[in-house]
């Protein structure tokens, strides 16, 4: 964990050196380019001038990333809403089972959560499956509240706040979305996104949307003040999303576990793992592990073909 912490500090330092506050290191345009990509404002709806945000995202939401990837693939290669029920070695490749169908592939990249990969590999390598299934995951809930900004009192400066665990609240953090990402909300609207759940509060997942919204409204009023965002201020819209077992936890001993996983994987030709459970939790890490897995499989296939 210490090594991971040092690596993260090194990445942040490199980002800061690229553009002073890390914005350009995150893919934001250079200052004065006239383009906005995740730039934020410390005041109002983030529409005017203000300090640049270190946070970046796609203007149309992260679904753009998936849509772009899908658009570059042959539609016949894509199977949506299809459950993979089994994966087993078959001659020089792998047989993947979806319902009653079985399909043969030269190589497979498992980009699923580690616990799902563990289930699929149980019959192939029980020890590997146990290692993957033992990687802990936590869940998350987001509660989005939309307000008429003129109805709210003055929010604190910045893009949101964290809630210390010692306070014993359901909320973990809150983001002022209208400040964090330019263009994400209409002018005059304020969107507050609260985060709940975590490894120690999984029970919240089973609460109703109404209860979760009421909990967030109450805690926001207590933290920010009733005059700023009290229960008397109506929300124009609410949205609750639950993300079950979505966030891999890099517990003590994770690096040692990864060494054991790699040892097992080295014996399974034509199979690789990718995703946020192994060597980095961010989107760039997922992209990196996916590319690395693809390159390794191509090189492996070429090596086998050349040896025949």
Regions found by a protein language model. Give the residues of each.
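FAD-binding beta-loop-beta segment adjacent to the flavin cofactor pocket
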Residues: 182-187, 242-273
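Short, basic, low-complexity termini and linkers enriched in Ser/Thr/Gly/Pro
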Residues: 23-31, 231, 299-308
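Short FAD-binding loop at a beta-strand-to-alpha-helix junction that anchors the flavin cofactor
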Residues: 192-193, 262-281, 286-289
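Active-site/ligand-binding neighborhood in enzyme catalytic cores
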Residues: 1-94, 104, 111
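Internal hydrophobic alpha-helix adjacent to the cofactor/substrate pocket in enzyme cavities
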Residues: 286-304
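Short glycine-/acidic-enriched loop or helix-start segments at secondary-structure transitions
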Residues: 119-121, 249-250, 283-284
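Mid-domain catalytic core of redox enzymes
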Residues: 80-210, 218-224, 263, 307-308
């Amino acid at each position: 964990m210490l090594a991971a912490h040092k690596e993260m500090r090194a990445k942040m330092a490199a980002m800061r050196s690229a553009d002073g506050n890390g914005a350009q290191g995150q893919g934001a345009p250079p200052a004065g380019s006239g383009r906005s990509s995740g730039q934020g404002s410390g005041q109002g709806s983030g529409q005017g001038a203000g300090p640049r945000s270190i946070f970046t995202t796609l203007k149309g939401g992260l679904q753009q990333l998936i849509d772009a990837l899908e658009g570059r693939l042959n539609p016949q290669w894509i199977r949506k809403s299809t459950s993979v029920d089994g994966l087993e070695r078959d001659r020089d490749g792998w047989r993947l089972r979806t319902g009653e169908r079985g399909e043969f592939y030269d190589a497979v990249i498992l980009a699923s959560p580690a616990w799902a990969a563990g289930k699929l590999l149980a019959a192939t390598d029980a020890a590997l499956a146990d290692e993957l299934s033992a990687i802990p995951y936590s869940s998350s809930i987001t509660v989005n509240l939309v307000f008429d900004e003129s109805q709210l009192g003055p929010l604190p400066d910045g893009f949101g706040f964290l809630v210390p665990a010692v306070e014993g609240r359901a909320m973990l953090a809150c983001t002022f979305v209208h400040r964090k990402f330019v263009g994400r909300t209409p002018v005059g609207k304020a969107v507050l996104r609260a985060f709940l759940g975590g490894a120690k509060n999984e029970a919240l997942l089973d609460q109703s949307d109404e209860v979760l919204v009421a909990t967030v409204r109450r805690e926001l009023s207590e933290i920010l003040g009733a005059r700023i965002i009290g229960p008397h201020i109506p929300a124009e819209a609410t949205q609750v999303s639950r993300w079950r077992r979505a966030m891999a936890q890099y517990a003590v001993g994770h690096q040692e576990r990864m060494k054991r996983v790699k040892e097992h994987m080295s014996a399974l030709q034509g199979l690789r793992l990718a995703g946020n459970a192994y060597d980095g939790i961010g989107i760039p890490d997922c992209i990196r592990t996916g590319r690395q897995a693809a390159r390794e499989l191509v090189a492996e296939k070429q090596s086998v073909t050349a040896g025949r």
